[in-house]
UniProtKB/Swiss-Prot annotation:
ZnF (RING-type) intervals: 185-220
Keywords: Metal-binding, Zinc, Zinc-finger
Record's keyword annotation contains Membrane: no
Region spans: Disordered: 65-89
Entry's family note: Belongs to the IIV-6 175R/332L family.
GO molecular function, one term: zinc ion binding
Protein name listed in UniProt: Uncharacterized RING finger protein 332L
Pfam family, one: zf-C3HC4_3
Amino acid sequence: MEYTRETMQKMRREELKNIAISYRIYNGYHERPISKMRKSDFIDFIHESVTTPNHSPNTRETILQNANRQEGRRRGLRPSSDGNLRRENRHNEDVIVHFIPSPLSSRHSPISFRDTLRDFDARRRIDFGSSLMGGPLGLLDVVINVLNSTSLDDEEQHELNNEEFTGTIPTEVEEENEAHETVRCAVCLHNKVCVLFQKCKHVITCGPCSLRIKECPVCKRIVESSDKIRIFLP
């Protein structure tokens, strides 16, 4: 439907706006939004862009393409090489991680591996301008957090290596005595063991309890009175 200038002069602004939208016109002169244009300028722009019969088909196609580009920019789209609109990708999907050293490698300590991840993280944040969780390396933040919580800084590692040992190292005699103190009778769980069962070689009971049992508590082997030998542990 063709609209003359006189016809559009009699229309309300809302009706003119609907006409412009139907022709995909959202901006007027100098990319000014149609909602902010004066009515007379609004009518002139619509009349020149769409309703003038002198426009050739190529001119009309150009007008529609410009309108499509305006709509695309408004929706965050961009024109592609084939003329169609494509949504802009805010992340670079062609990321290739060429090398990340293994934390178990002999050439890289866990601390240097952590520093490498930090440097890579910083460079990637600059390249993408967004959080890592939205990109292909979404787990990198998790790895860095784990390393930060379990690894020591260089200064802390140096202090730990240079810290003097203030404890005591037990001797063999002390360890043996402590072991004897903890070996208790398997029957009463109170007295120290002091009886050797000669056949099975088990030392597992105290003197009073060995008189009341007829088999070894460990291997269940029959123990005669002649097989019970009292020993004295140091």
